[in-house]
From Swiss-Prot:
UniProt-recorded name of the protein: ATP-dependent protease subunit HslV
GO biological process: proteolysis involved in protein catabolic process
CDD domains assigned: protease_HslV (cd01913)
The organism of origin for this protein: Caldicellulosiruptor saccharolyticus (strain ATCC 43494 / DSM 8903 / Tp8T 6331)
Catalysed reactions, as listed in the record: ATP-dependent cleavage of peptide bonds with broad specificity
Entry's Gene Ontology cellular component terms: HslUV protease complex; proteasome core complex
Any one GO molecular function term: threonine-type endopeptidase activity
HAMAP family: HslV
Length: 176
């Protein structure tokens, strides 16, 4: 199975950024790819998405999420709740092993494989193997610097990559 990644997102005011590393690990012990793109803009560039977990599962969920955005005219909150509901109830989707962070200029959500939707109180989220390190770094940077969300997300991922063996420094940062 391919997995292991780190995604971090930071929202300050109406600015939001998401960053992901590029490493894809196969079977816990082999780097298969070093420059994968695990973050993207969807819905005409108005929504950011980052995913971690099984690659095929994450892509499937991202596609489902895009469908929900289209059905709900870009309403992020409604789309993410409907995705989570479908994820929990569908026998096939329920088996997918992935996590997603989705964000726009108004909201930032983490959607879990068990169908949970969480909007972090501090507008900072991180998922994947290096998630705890990236989250701690991002929180420290938000509290102690005046950096922009994109700079915070990138720096937090760099810190995570220096600690987590499943995270690398080939970082993609997207912002709104």
């Amino acid at each position: 199975m391919f997995h292991a990644t780190t995604i971090v997102a930071v929202k300050k005011g109406e600015k939001v950024a998401i960053a992901g590393d590029g490493q894809v690990t196969f079977s816990q012990n082999m780097i298969m790819k070093q420059n994968a793109k695990k973050v993207r803009k969807v819905y005409n560039g108005k929504v950011l998405v980052g995913f971690a977990g099984s690659v095929a599962d994450a892509i499937t969920l991202c596609e489902k999420f895009e469908e929900k955005l289209e059905q709900n005219s870009g309403n992020l909150q409604k789309s993410v709740v409907e995705l989570a509901k479908e994820w929990r109830q569908d026998k096939i989707l329920r088996r997918l092993e992935a996590l997603m962070i989705v964000a726009n200029s108004e909201h930032l959500f983490v959607v879990s494989g068990s169908g949970e939707v969480v909007e972090p109180d501090d507008n900072i989220a991180a998922i994947g193997s290096g998630g705890p390190y990236a989250l701690a770094a991002a929180r420290a940077l938000v509290q102690n610097t005046n950096l922009e969300p994109a700079e915070i997300a990138k720096k937090a991922l760099e810190i995570a990559a220096s600690i987590c063996i499943y995270t690398n420094n080939n970082i993609t940062v997207l912002e709104l």
